[in-house]
């Protein structure tokens, strides 16, 4: 099997610019890259989709590179964004670069900073050497540009595709990168790079663009920094492994096949066996547990997965006796759960509203009527006073509904 066949079977391949050219490429002499702009302190689960696909290319013998957007991150990609990005200052970009570089290297990827492509190039050289390669009418015709042009598109963002295109040309010439991989929203920028290569190298070039489907929520909206991915960072200090585990565990059966195909490094046949067992008895959530376990371990490591599983058992296994937990256990759990400070004798509902865990008195009454607010598995009333009886009175578990768990910490 080849990599394209694998991606097709996994239902993640979106587009490829030229299948014939790709078929003639030799993995051992072909580089593949994905670009990651340092527009935040961490990558998120949506980015991890591309990391995982890049690692699949690596498994098939390709040379793989992650191009860190030290230059492009200072400009901002306008592709399918509703409004102008807020430009980051140099200090923020450099801070983000350092953290994201470490994340990418933790997956065994070679990281290249595209700032090095431009740092010694002045504006006149850029206009002569890069701008000359692309026609303005061609740039204007891009769907990503057309969607923004009526709402306002700065020249800065308009030129982003020139930078990404030149990245492809530069890596093609210097590193033997013949394949640029990206999410489906990057198609226009990738094709710009191929056109640049064609003008410089000629029609017999070997450059190919490959795009894959974007990770979206159940409503079909892309999961990114500003659309939900911000809650799913792959930095455990920004998103706990427990939270990531719970997110994946909560995925609906209607999406689980797609997510397993995309995220899991098991073969399609092995995944199908898991799905068959799961749908024979969906209440076991076998497929969701398989997905959550593999992704959390791949991103955060085996120890963090073990901790996430243990906390899940503590919080959601009705047969588990929480009273056996020690204060040391609670101090660890505090790193994984939303924590609400509260004093002995304080009103529970007032404290929850103040800390925005409950929206209003009305919402509180609705949950109380449904018997869906509990402290240490005991139902509370609207006028309940905080008086914990477990863990030496220093902690208590608060549950809102079936899934939201908060740790009360006595202050």
UniProtKB/Swiss-Prot annotation:
<feature type="short sequence motif" description="'KMSKS' region">
    <location>
        <begin position="222"/>
        <end position="226"/>
    </location>
</feature>
<dbReference type="GO" id="GO:0004831">
    <property type="term" value="F:tyrosine-tRNA ligase activity"/>
</dbReference>
<feature type="binding site">
    <location>
        <position position="160"/>
    </location>
    <ligand>
        <name>L-tyrosine</name>
    </ligand>
</feature>
<feature type="binding site">
    <location>
        <position position="33"/>
    </location>
    <ligand>
        <name>L-tyrosine</name>
    </ligand>
</feature>
<feature type="binding site">
    <location>
        <position position="164"/>
    </location>
    <ligand>
        <name>L-tyrosine</name>
    </ligand>
</feature>
<feature type="binding site">
    <location>
        <position position="225"/>
    </location>
    <ligand>
        <name>ATP</name>
    </ligand>
</feature>
<keyword id="KW-0648">Protein biosynthesis</keyword>
<dbReference type="GO" id="GO:0005829">
    <property type="term" value="C:cytosol"/>
</dbReference>
<keyword id="KW-0030">Aminoacyl-tRNA synthetase</keyword>
<comment type="function">
    <text>Catalyzes the attachment of tyrosine to tRNA(Tyr) in a two-step reaction: tyrosine is first activated by ATP to form Tyr-AMP and then transferred to the acceptor end of tRNA(Tyr).</text>
</comment>
<comment type="subunit">
    <text>Homodimer.</text>
</comment>
<feature type="short sequence motif" description="'HIGH' region">
    <location>
        <begin position="38"/>
        <end position="47"/>
    </location>
</feature>
<keyword id="KW-0547">Nucleotide-binding</keyword>
<comment type="similarity">
    <text>Belongs to the class-I aminoacyl-tRNA synthetase family. TyrS type 1 subfamily.</text>
</comment>
<dbReference type="GO" id="GO:0005524">
    <property type="term" value="F:ATP binding"/>
</dbReference>
<dbReference type="GO" id="GO:0003723">
    <property type="term" value="F:RNA binding"/>
</dbReference>
<dbReference type="InterPro" id="IPR024088">
    <property type="entry name" value="Tyr-tRNA-ligase_bac-type"/>
</dbReference>
<dbReference type="InterPro" id="IPR002307">
    <property type="entry name" value="Tyr-tRNA-ligase"/>
</dbReference>
<dbReference type="InterPro" id="IPR024107">
    <property type="entry name" value="Tyr-tRNA-ligase_bac_1"/>
</dbReference>
<dbReference type="Pfam" id="PF00579">
    <property type="entry name" value="tRNA-synt_1b"/>
</dbReference>
<dbReference type="Pfam" id="PF22421">
    <property type="entry name" value="SYY_C-terminal"/>
</dbReference>
<keyword id="KW-0963">Cytoplasm</keyword>
<dbReference type="InterPro" id="IPR014729">
    <property type="entry name" value="Rossmann-like_a/b/a_fold"/>
</dbReference>
<keyword id="KW-0067">ATP-binding</keyword>
<keyword id="KW-0694">RNA-binding</keyword>
<dbReference type="InterPro" id="IPR002305">
    <property type="entry name" value="aa-tRNA-synth_Ic"/>
</dbReference>
<dbReference type="InterPro" id="IPR054608">
    <property type="entry name" value="SYY-like_C"/>
</dbReference>
<dbReference type="InterPro" id="IPR036986">
    <property type="entry name" value="S4_RNA-bd_sf"/>
</dbReference>
<feature type="domain" description="S4 RNA-binding">
    <location>
        <begin position="347"/>
        <end position="411"/>
    </location>
</feature>
<dbReference type="InterPro" id="IPR001412">
    <property type="entry name" value="aa-tRNA-synth_I_CS"/>
</dbReference>
<keyword id="KW-0436">Ligase</keyword>
<dbReference type="GO" id="GO:0006437">
    <property type="term" value="P:tyrosyl-tRNA aminoacylation"/>
</dbReference>
<protein>
    <recommendedName>
        <fullName>Tyrosine--tRNA ligase</fullName>
        <ecNumber>6.1.1.1</ecNumber>
    </recommendedName>
</protein>
